[in-house]
A protein has these predicted regions:
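Midchain, well-structured core segments that form catalytic/ion-binding scaffolds
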Residues: 1-154
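Glycine- and other small-residue-rich loops at beta-strand/loop junctions that grip anionic moieties
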Residues: 8, 190, 216
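Catalytic-loop motifs flanking and including active-site residues across diverse enzymes
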Residues: 15-19, 50, 165, 197, ...
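A structural preference for short, hydrophobic beta-strand core positions in alpha/beta folds
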Residues: 36, 91-93, 180-184, 215-217
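Short glycine/threonine-rich loop-to-helix capping motif typified by GTGT followed
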Residues: 43-51, 99-105, 190-203, 226-230
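Zn-dependent metallopeptidase/amidohydrolase metal-coordination segment
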Residues: 129, 133-146, 153, 202-237
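C-terminal, non-catalytic macromolecule-binding modules
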Residues: 151-177
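Generic long, charged, amphipathic alpha-helical segments
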Residues: 174-208
């Protein structure tokens, strides 16, 4: 879990992305239908939990899936134990009557989208100690009675790179038959290697407190991006 801006560099596991891989791998060896799936609460939060219910036609196939699921959980735990020591996966098989499920073609497209959608960091600034420049976070995934929703939060301090990320998701949506909507957008705020106001701020801090100010760039949306877009040439820190 954590904030997808401030903590995306911690290499935290995203439960929605793990579920996408989980469903993909199960689908290679078993035939299931997706009854429902729900993961995450906010698009800008790294997903901590994701749960789903699958339907199998017979108990033998369900038992096979249970064994595969347990094996996959062990593989995931081994892969992420260094940064997610508290990872857990609960698996239960129950008997019941038939239920409504996501249509087969929609389910395949859904799983493929979850599996292939970019997530995490995909560009850093090596001149700034690996400062994150571009990332995305699959924050919410949910099936409803008549639609499937995937909410993603892409971030970049560079406008052109943000547009590149958006085009990737637009292409994925088109490929798998999803509609895409944009909301809550705000402009990026590129780091200025030279800043007179920053130099003045550092000098003033030194004079006032007798110590050096710690400067830190963060991969998160700030009002400065809005101000900088509205006032070209603004020197903001």
């Amino acid at each position: 879990g954590g904030h997808s801006g401030a903590e995306i560099d911690k290499n935290r596991a995203n439960a929605n992305k793990l579920m996408g891989l989980f469903l993909y791998e199960l689908g290679q060896k078993t035939a299931y239908s997706i009854k429902d799936l729900s993961g995450g609460t906010k698009d800008n939060a790294i997903t901590r939990e994701c749960e789903m219910s699958l339907i199998y036609a017979d108990s033998a196939e369900a038992q096979k899936a249970e064994k595969l699921a347990c094996d996959l959980a062990e593989v995931f735990a081994d892969e992420i134990t260094s940064f997610e020591p508290d990872f857990s996966c609960e698996i239960a098989v129950t008997e019941g009557q038939s239920a409504m499920a996501v249509q087969e073609e929609d389910a395949k497209a859904f799983v493929s989208l979850m599996r292939l959608a970019p997530n995490g960091i995909y560009r850093r600034n090596i001149k700034m100690n690996g400062f994150v420049v571009v990332s995305s976070n699959m924050g919410v995934v949910r099936t409803e009675e008549d639609y499937i929703m995937v909410a993603v939060s892409p971030r970049s301090s560079v406008a052109s790179l943000q547009e590149d990320t958006k085009s990737r998701f637009a292409l994925l949506a088109e490929t798998f038959g999803f509609e895409i909507e944009y909301s809550g957008e705000y402009p990026g705020w590129s780091y200025a290697e030279e800043s007179k106001i920053r130099d003045l701020f550092v000098e003033s801090y030194r004079d006032l407190f007798g110590s050096e100010l710690r400067l830190e760039a963060i991969h998160a949306g700030l009002e400065c991006g809005l101000f900088s877009e509205a006032i070209p040439g603004l020197d903001a820190i």
